[in-house]
Amino acid sequence: GLRSASLSNLDNRYVLDGKIYLDPRVNAKWALPRIGERKPLSIELSGGVGWHTKMPDISKLYPDLFYYDLIQLNFFSNENPAVNRMNVRTFVDDLTNYNLKAARNMKWEVRADFSIDDHRLLVTYFREKMTSGFRQGKSYTRYIYNRYSTEGLDPSTMTGPPDLADLTFTPDTILKVQSVHTNGSRILKEGVEFQYSSKRFPIIRTRLTVNGAWFRTTYNNSQPVYKRPSVVIDGRQIRYIGLYNEDDGYIRESFNTNFTFDTDIPRLKLGFSTSI
């Protein structure tokens, strides 16, 4: 099978604009010749491989604007409120990641099915890999502003707020971290699923079913990340940012098994099961 996915009516600045993703899927099944005559063994092998595309949602495509206020001047006097003045410079940033792509996932699996004398065993192994999953990444922006000096100003002799043109200032720079949506998640999933069902034993009219699975998930960052040290020298934080690979991640494993005893008593028209 083949499925296509695309987002329409996007701004041409998006890399997703006009891009079509194709998700092919192939399944195959092979039944081997039976082995034996009295109680023949049946074996079936099957498998499949395919792609799955997940598009970013509205919140990722159109994030809110980021507003950042920096105080350049804050002159205040209790005795003469008429001279009070504050000057704030506001920065407005667009946090849209126009390079955001769809998250692509490739999964394949194989299955073996064995049947003999009403006993059946199914074993499935699967593996799933995604290297472009969505996550919140960090982006640093440099903001340059002026810090005005109020040294030498005497509120008692002033008739109005200070004029910025008459004040000396020192240019300053601040690095601000922001959250942006990226394709920085790498996820690898693999596992084995199995199920065994026995024939119904005549004496106790009971059938045993055993099913379970083993799963393993590996999650980490597929893109470099920015980090800023928290060291403070002379009352100011260091203005350097480092770029590092894979600063986080984890591996999760789980295994579970379930035993079910299914009993049928036709004379009493009664059936019940017990699971452990």
Q: What feature does the model see in each segment?
A:
Residues 1-120, 124-128:
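Structural signature of Gram-negative outer-membrane beta-barrels, strongest in the C-terminal barrel
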Residues 5, 129, 147-275:
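Gram-negative outer-membrane beta-barrel transporters
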Residues 5-11, 54-60, 69-71, 121, ...:
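Outer-membrane beta-barrel proteins
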Residues 14, 21, 30, 62, ...:
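Sequence-level detector for tyrosine residue identity
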Residues 22, 58, 100, 134, ...:
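Short clusters of hydrophobic/aromatic residues that line enzyme substrate/ligand-binding pockets
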